[in-house]
A protein has these predicted regions:
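Short, Lys/Arg-enriched N-terminal segments with co-localized hydrophobic residues
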Residues: 1-8
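FMN-binding flavodoxin-like domain, especially the glycine-rich phosphate-binding loop
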Residues: 11-12, 18, 24, 32-37, ...
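A short beta-strand-loop structural module common to alpha/beta enzyme folds
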Residues: 35-46
């Protein structure tokens, strides 16, 4: 797809950012540099996504899953047969399985996935002062912006 066609596509990112704001930092930077509407699934449990050409779901990883607010939002609001992309921040490792199970039911096509480290002090990580300090950093943010621009 040509760059001009990509720019015309109407995109939204539905996100949840709970502990340290890692995911919010990423999606707000994307929204500043790309034409993307942001929907905070923690504050807004309903939205009409039918007019969007592509929908992103962004979350920190909690116990190897996307946040419950994202999973419930996708289950309830994602129309069938939509193009989607996924973004996650994590202390341990990326894991898309929880959201992909819902996307499969909705016959969504995943056009891309992006993940980066995010500062994490949950559970045992708190004892050592957290992991992935300083992330997402400027390079992580730039990579996320480029990821969305190239969709």
């Amino acid at each position: 797809m040509e760059q001009a066609e990509r720019k015309k596509m109407r995109k939204a990112i539905v996100y949840a950012s709970i502990h340290h704001g890692n995911t919010e930092k990423i999606v707000k930077s994307i929204a500043e540099r790309c034409q993307v509407d942001l929907i905070d699934a923690v504050k807004q449990s309903d939205a009409d996504l039918s007019n969007y050409d592509m929908i992103g779901f962004a979350s920190g990883i909690y116990f190897s899953k996307f946040h419950q607010s994202i999973l419930k939002f996708a289950e309830k609001n994602l129309p069938d047969d939509k193009k989607v992309f996924l973004i996650c921040t994590y202390g341990g490792s990326a894991n898309y399985k929880s959201i992909e199970q819902i996307l499969d039911k909705k016959h969504a096509s995943v056009d891309g996935k992006f993940g980066c480290k995010g500062y994490d002090t949950f559970g045992p990580f708190k004892l050592v002062g957290g992991i992935a300090k300083g992330h997402p950093d400027d390079k992580d943010i730039q990579n996320a912006v480029e990821f969305v621009k190239n969709l």
